[in-house]
Amino acid sequence: MIQAGEYSAVLHYLKAVADVGVRAAKASGAETVARMKAMPTDDDAFGPGTIRADGRKLHPAYLFEVKKPEESRGPFNYYRLLQTTDAADAFRPLGDGGCPLVRA
């Protein structure tokens, strides 16, 4: 999952740079990060999500089961979705993290 996370992060960063402009992004990394937190995320690896104040990427979490060979209906039909956990419930609450960058 490391590669998928890197793909998601870089794609979102490039979208934020395009939004603020290359010159502004080079001048202020803080402005770029603020834009990344303000913009919703959306990519093929994790789908829609957000970045909260402490920098954690929030997205739904999925529980899949591998199908038996006879249940598969063709190529790449290997998994059955059992449960989806909303992004707000899938990660530790912001207040429980103790991040010094987040001021209550």
Where are these regions (language model features)?
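Extracytosolic ligand-binding ectodomains
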Residues: M1-A104
